């Protein structure tokens, strides 16, 4: 049975919206990237939502692009963890002059839900991304990428909105639409590796301590769905995906969605991101396809080891 994310996880969606918004109607200028790499500027009306009063993250301060962003990685020492029989999450954040380096054992910080035929085991993730990323002349498609596109601030790999070739009746389908993800937007793969295809800023998922919930492999930060409208981030708005469902996402998800920003308020670009008030690019995790990253706006850093591996097919 296929379950709409908007219905099945409405509680999580409302929690996501409760991270900050402008309380009064207003107008804002939203600058975004097209697939050709050109910037477009539109005026978007900011309207109040029916969501509960917004909560500002405990750490509302945001690092300047180029600073070592250790402050946005949450303290995981007191989290529940995957379960008594599993290792606790371990995440190490370091920076060189040019790179952000994150090492993780890949263990979720919340209870593991066995939704696939695969188990859950510790991994040896090491991600290296540019500390001072720049927007590329053209965007890079991720439609054929089956593997890591980034990582969360809790040390988990981020995959695209596409599952692998197994099960065959859902080959390369939308894992959110097909209902094969847990309440935090993840599941385990063939190598017993936990990864996220979607991100939800729920307290349970330990992604509420900062507006930034992850980083893409091109180095740009991934925010939750709330976007800053000024440099100090004292004014915010909820941003949404620009993709419409135009086909059946059960299989080949990229054939089932079409980008269309017409008539939408606070819509993101085709990469699911935008240029913020400080002039730098950022992605946003959204409740709708492509959920996290729609394409790379910058140049992805070549990874090594496990981080460079493609996503193997699911068992069974």
Report residues per predicted region.
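Solvent-exposed N-terminal domain segments of exported/luminal and surface proteins
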Residues: 23, 30-179
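Bacterial N-terminal signal peptides that target proteins for export
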Residues: 1-8
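Short helix-loop boundary/capping segments
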Residues: 177, 199-252
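Short loop/beta submotifs within extracellular cysteine-rich repeat domains
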Residues: 137, 202-207, 289-294
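Extracellular/lumenal glycan-associated surfaces
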Residues: 154-156, 190-203, 277-290
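Short, flexible domain-boundary/linker segments around small modular repeats
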Residues: 149-184, 237-271
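C-terminal motif of bacterial Sec signal peptides marking the signal peptidase cleavage site
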Residues: 15-18
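Long, compositionally biased interface segments
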Residues: 37, 52-56, 249-316
């Amino acid at each position: 049975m296929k379950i709409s994310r908007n219905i099945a996880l409405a509680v999580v969606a409302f929690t996501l919206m409760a991270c900050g918004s402008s309380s009064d109607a207003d107008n804002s200028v939203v600058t975004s990237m097209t697939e050709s790499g050109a910037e477009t500027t539109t005026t978007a009306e900011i309207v109040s939502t029916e969501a509960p009063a917004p909560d500002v993250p405990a750490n509302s301060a945001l690092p300047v692009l180029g600073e070592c962003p250790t402050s946005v990685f949450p303290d995981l020492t007191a989290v529940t963890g995957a379960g008594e029989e599993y290792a606790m999450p371990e995440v190490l954040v370091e920076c060189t002059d040019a790179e952000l380096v994150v090492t993780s054992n890949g263990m979720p910080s919340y209870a593991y839900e066995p939704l696939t035929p695969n188990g859950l085991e510790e991994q040896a993730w090491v991600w290296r991304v540019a500390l001072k990323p720049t927007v590329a002349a053209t965007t890079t498609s991720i439609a054929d990428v089956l593997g890591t596109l980034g990582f969360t601030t809790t040390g988990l790999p981020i995959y695209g909105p596409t599952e692998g070739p197994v099960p065959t009746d859902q080959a390369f389908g939308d894992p959110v639409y097909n209902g094969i993800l847990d309440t935090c937007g993840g599941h385990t793969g063939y190598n017993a590796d936990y990864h996220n295809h979607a991100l939800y800023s729920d307290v349970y998922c330990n992604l509420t301590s900062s507006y930034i919930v992850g980083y893409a492999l091109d180095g740009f930060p991934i925010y939750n769905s709330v976007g800053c409208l000024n440099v100090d981030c004292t004014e915010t708005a909820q941003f949404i995906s620009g993709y419409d469902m135009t086909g059946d996402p059960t299989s080949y998800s990229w054939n089932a969605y079409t980008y269309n920003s017409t008539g939408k308020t606070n819509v993101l670009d085709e990469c699911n991101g935008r240029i913020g008030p400080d002039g730098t690019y950022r992605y946003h995790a959204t409740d709708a396809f492509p959920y996290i990253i729609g394409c790379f706006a910058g140049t992805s850093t070549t990874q090594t080891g496990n981080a460079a591996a493609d996503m193997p097919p699911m068992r069974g």
